[in-house]
């Protein structure tokens, strides 16, 4: 006797891509990536080259934030403002380096995965997305565009 289970695999637009074609795609791609990160591994599409690059940003998060697992566990992800203030203690807004920008993305992706749901995002994993969007600006998107391509 076998069970027939139908599972939805989350497959965002940029997941299978190798690169971005326009700076205008960066914010959308990062939004999709954090959302994708909040799904269980078996419920999301395999990463293409572009998402593999984004996954490597977790290494930058380890360098900047040291123990990201403990940081992610202890941050108040139910409060976006408090989370951004904590991150700003590590990384001031003015003149962020490429490593610091990547670390913010890596930290938020780690949080989305850590707090994510089985087949859908949770409020904490969605707040990781909102924290990233709050922390990054157009200049940061330009810098990340160059690193992603």
From Swiss-Prot:
Q: What are the UniProt keywords, alphabetically?
A: Early protein, Host-virus interaction, Inhibition of host NF-kappa-B by virus
Gene3D superfamilies for this protein: dsDNA poxvirus (1.10.437.20)
One GO BP on record is:
symbiont-mediated suppression of host NF-kappaB cascade
Q: Which Pfam families match?
A: Poxv_Bcl-2-like (PF06227)
Q: Which InterPro entries match?
A: Poxvirus_B14/B22/C16, Poxvirus_Bcl-2-like, Poxvirus_sf
Question: What biological function has been recorded for the protein in this entry?
Answer: Contributes to virulence by binding to the host IKBKB subunit of the IKK complex and preventing host NF-kappa-B activation in response to pro-inflammatory stimuli such as TNF-alpha or IL1B. Mechanistically, sterically hinders the direct contact between the kinase domains of IKBKB in the IKK complex containing IKBKB, CHUK/IKKA and NEMO.
Subunit comment: Homodimers. Interacts with host IKBKB; this interaction inhibits host NF-kappa-B activation.
Family note: Belongs to the orthopoxvirus OPG200 family.
Q: What is this protein called?
A: Protein OPG200
Organism from which the protein derives: Vaccinia virus (strain Copenhagen)
Gene symbol of the encoding locus: OPG200
